[in-house]
Amino acid sequence: GDTETAQFIIPSEKTTVYGNDTISVTISRDYTWEKIGTADFTDGIFTGAAATVDVKKAKEGTNLYKFVAPMRTLYKQNGETTLPGGVDLIFTMDEEGNITMDQGIYEVESGTSLIEEGNASLYYACKQYPDMCFFDNNNGVITLSTLLAIGEKLYGPYTWTFDWNNGYPYAAK
């Protein structure tokens, strides 16, 4: 992934006393992903079911990884025909296996009968809720602890577990 930043500057004679006279816009190009392994995913939020998901790494020399569409894959492997969106779980992992993910709201469950009130999203706010939103990596068994947002309410914490048993780059020898 490449990024480019452009700055737009408003001439001083056209600005007001409030607001910004400069706006920066960053444009990102998607990464090239290559499959490096698989992980056994267990959904501790909605179903308790398990599935095998692909693990991919960005080829552009980063420590950027993703678990590919865990909920969609789980539904498909368990014979469901109504599938949620295919949201990937993207994260960085350093050479010691420490994992970080951008804070944010990630829609993971929509279009199925599990959520009657609409869409459900992972509400990952590790700065605001450090005891409830975090990653734990025990030699490739990765647990995501997160809150769940349905409408305007938060629930949890809940966990997703990924046993990265095929292709984990930092396995103990």
Segment roles from a protein language model:
Residues 2-8, 140:
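Exposed beta-strand face motif in extracellular beta-rich ectodomains
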Residues 9-10, 43:
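Short intrinsically disordered, low-complexity segments
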Residues 10-14, 148:
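Surface-exposed loop/turn motifs at beta-strand-loop junctions within extracellular Ig-like
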Residues 13-22:
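Short, exposed coil/turn segments at beta-strand boundaries within extracellular/luminal domains
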Residues 26-173:
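Ser/Thr/Gly/Pro-rich, low-complexity flexible regions
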